[in-house]
Amino acid sequence: MKSRILATAVASVTMLAMAFVANAGQPEKEELVYHDATEFLIGGKATQKTLTPYDRLPASYEKTTRPELWRHGHHSAGIYVRFRTDSPIIKARWTSLYGAYMNHMAPSGIRGLDLYVLDEGKWYFTGVGRPSKNDKTSEYVLVKNMDRKEREYMIYLSLYDGVTSLEIGVDKASVIGKPQVDSPRRGCPIVMYGTSILQGGCVSRPGMAHTSLLERALDMEVINLGFSGNALLDLDIAQLMASVETPAVYVLDNAPICRADRINAHSVEFFRVLRDAHPDVPVVIVEHPLYPTMRLNNAEREDIIARNNAQKAFYETLRKAGEKRIYYVSAEKLLDEMKEGTVDGDHFTDLGVTYYVKAVMPTIKKALKASPNKVGK
């Protein structure tokens, strides 16, 4: 009996010693300290006068704007947080406003986050925050196992849900603070107005929205004023766009939700609000994409053609009135020739967004050259 107890004790000590040797030199589990993201730089907003840090519409609009539009204003599409840290691990803890779900879009795009790192002047994707399935509060490690080196980071917030709180977790021995590099360059943003597609439907994660792709490609802040089902040329949105102090370019991409009669009735008045506030700022007008379903759906084909005819007539009206610095993007190249690029025939996948950006980029660059408001390198 004694020999059995002794053998067991020896075996236990041996196993403990082996475990100690195996763990020798291994780093201890990181102890994280969380920081409220509002301590850092929040970008991608037309105004800071919002109910919460991650809203897109002014608090003053709560009682005056349409309820549907106000609700979508809580969605944090296009908003980002910029910071720097030398932490070897970055974790996010965030709470969604609605806990939204859609059957044609990935949860990581609806209410997730993603992380980018600035390396030699360019932004690179480095991690995604996947939302919790059954809880509005989510925690996710965005990146880990890095060298302890100070880097500049950007977190894009959820596209189709609001964010009520966001905390960034870093190693307790790390330094974290506001960014030291102005990228994306701020001060003269591109202000884009549009529908669910512009809001980000239905890309896989927030950084793939085409406003964000343009933002990184041009190294310029882009304000996403995409409102799913609600880009109806409301004048309060025109006034919000006009309130941006030094916009570089305005982009009007509302045709996918505005029928031809609404475009005919309200576009010039909407444009006039922008032009009265900023007479020399270029305006880019974008046609309705040619959806793949147009091939067989006769009613949809006729509707889209009518909308684009109305959009072109709006542009021609401005041109004949002597308006300068107005630009037009036709529909033909907004999707690829085979029309592969949508999840449901309407909303763009990541592939569709890349085609869109390729199509609009030359016109936006031309407009930027003509703009009186430029950001310096």
Residues covered by each model-derived region:
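N-terminal secretory targeting modules
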Residues: 2-7, 17-189, 367-377
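Catalytic nucleophile-elbow at a beta strand-turn-alpha helix junction centered on a G-D-S/GDSL motif
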Residues: 187-211
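Oxyanion-hole/transition-state-stabilizing segment in secreted/luminal serine hydrolases
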Residues: 202, 206, 214, 232-277, ...
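A general structural detector for well-ordered alpha-helical segments in enzyme core domains, enriched
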Residues: 210, 266, 270, 307-314
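Short helix-loop-beta junction
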Residues: 211-224, 316
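Catalytic His-Asp segment of secreted/periplasmic serine-dependent ester chemistry enzymes
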Residues: 243, 291-377
